[in-house]
């Protein structure tokens, strides 16, 4: 019987594109996503295809959504004799867990548009290397029906603590927003615990970026990653 992968070896694959108007750059895009470094079985092939598809979607998004805005801003600036703007989009990633048969990471996108703050986005992925498929969040709470409530209560406690200490600021209606904007796909594993996050603007002002809460391993009901991996 062929042994399952315990870790996944990858390297960044970087791709860049530039769009011009009248020979002037109006939009640049940079994409850095993981790529398995050598044949490692079906799981590695699925990972490769998954991030190849994400790369294509990113550049299609840039061309279909950002490029028309960039061209419009360019012509408006040209007509008003203002400095010519250039939009920028960056997609990158960070591997946060790579052991015990699980590979976890988040990808992050940053859009820089003239006249406004950078827009940030994040996506979490956790892969079961034995099965070759993503692991649903609830799999880390076996037998716990109220796992969502556990996460929401933890986030609420962290927000109350941060606001009391004056280290962060959240919307006045953050308690309702926590439940409304909770997405079980927005998580990844770290050495400290299970990190789950909310989109920019969803529960906090722009200055707070992407709010992240990390439920520590050892919390009742949260399964340790090593125990998640099939033997």
Language model: regions and residue ranges:
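Compositionally biased intrinsically disordered regions enriched in Thr/Gly
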Residues: 1-231
């Amino acid at each position: 019987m062929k042994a399952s992968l315990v870790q996944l070896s990858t390297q960044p694959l970087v791709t860049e594109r530039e769009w011009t108007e009248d020979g002037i750059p109006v939009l640049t895009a940079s994409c850095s996503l993981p790529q398995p470094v050598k044949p490692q079985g079906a799981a590695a092939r699925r990972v490769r295809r998954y991030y190849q598809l994400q790369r294509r979607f990113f550049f299609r998004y840039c061309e279909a959504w950002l490029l028309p805005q960039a061209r419009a801003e360019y012509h408006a600036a040209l007509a008003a004799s203002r400095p010519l703007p250039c939009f920028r989009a960056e997609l990158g990633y960070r591997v946060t867990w790579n052991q015990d048969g699980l590979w976890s990471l988040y990808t992050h996108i940053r859009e820089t548009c003239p006249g406004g703050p950078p827009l940030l986005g994040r996506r979490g992925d956790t892969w079961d290397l034995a099965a070759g498929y993503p692991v649903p969040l609830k799999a880390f709470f076996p037998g716990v029906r109220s796992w969502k409530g556990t996460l929401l209560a933890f986030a609420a406690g962290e927000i109350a603590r941060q606001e009391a200490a004056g280290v962060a600021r959240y919307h006045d209606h953050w308690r309702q927003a926590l439940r409304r904007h909770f997405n079980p796909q927005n998580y990844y594993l770290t050495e400290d615990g299970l990190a789950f996050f909310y989109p920019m603007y969803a529960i906090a002002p722009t200055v707070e970026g992407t709010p992240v809460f990390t439920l520590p391993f050892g919390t009742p009901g949260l399964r340790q990653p090593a125990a998640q991996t099939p033997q």
